[in-house]
């Protein structure tokens, strides 16, 4: 199957045409690598002190919640799925239905650039299975296997 060529980086405006997430829950700022043949994507999230979750997690020592790092990986997988399958985000929603083997190795704090490396393992009907690693400065800070299911609006 021949895939269209996308000019990189894919910015946040283009990302918003592919997945339905919006501020404050859009957790991928750009796509910096994309290989649809290999079913691999690399996204980026610039973590700033202005993130709403830092107000309560934790006020005197802000740390990005691990579940949001996993969500960011799932969103990167969703972008890849939309680009690879040519689906319109308005007609198809993907819900995270399972997380396995989640590991959190290091805290993510304001000022970090979170790199989201996601590999699609399989796509069966409306179910996508992904493996993702989140990195800061080349070091794995979190990883997980994620399953997402598609559903009509």
Curated annotation (Swiss-Prot):
It is an enzyme of class 4 (lyase). The active site is at 57. GO terms for biological process: fatty acid biosynthetic process; lipid A biosynthetic process. Keywords: Cytoplasm, Lipid A biosynthesis, Lipid biosynthesis, Lipid metabolism, Lyase. InterPro entries: FabA_FabZ, FabZ, HotDog_dom_sf. Its main location: cytoplasm. This is 3-hydroxyacyl-[acyl-carrier-protein] dehydratase FabZ.
């Amino acid at each position: 199957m021949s895939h269209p060529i996308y000019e990189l980086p894919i910015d946040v405006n283009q990302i918003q045409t592919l997945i339905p997430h919006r501020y404050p829950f859009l957790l991928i700022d750009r796509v910096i690598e994309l290989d649809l043949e290999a079913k691999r994507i690399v996204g980026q999230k610039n973590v700033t002190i202005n993130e709403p979750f830092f107000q309560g997690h934790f006020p005197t020592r802000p740390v990005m919640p691990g579940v949001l790092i996993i969500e960011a990986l799932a969103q990167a997988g969703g972008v890849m799925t939309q680009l690879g399958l040519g689906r319109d985000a308005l007609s198809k929603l993907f819900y995270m239905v399972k997380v396995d083997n989640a590991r959190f190795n290091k805290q993510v704090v304001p000022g970090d650039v979170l790199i989201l490396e996601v590999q699609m393992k399989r796509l069966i009907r409306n179910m996508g299975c992904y493996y993702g690693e989140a990195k800061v400065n080349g070091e794995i800070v979190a990883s997980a296997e994620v399953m997402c299911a598609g559903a009509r609006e």
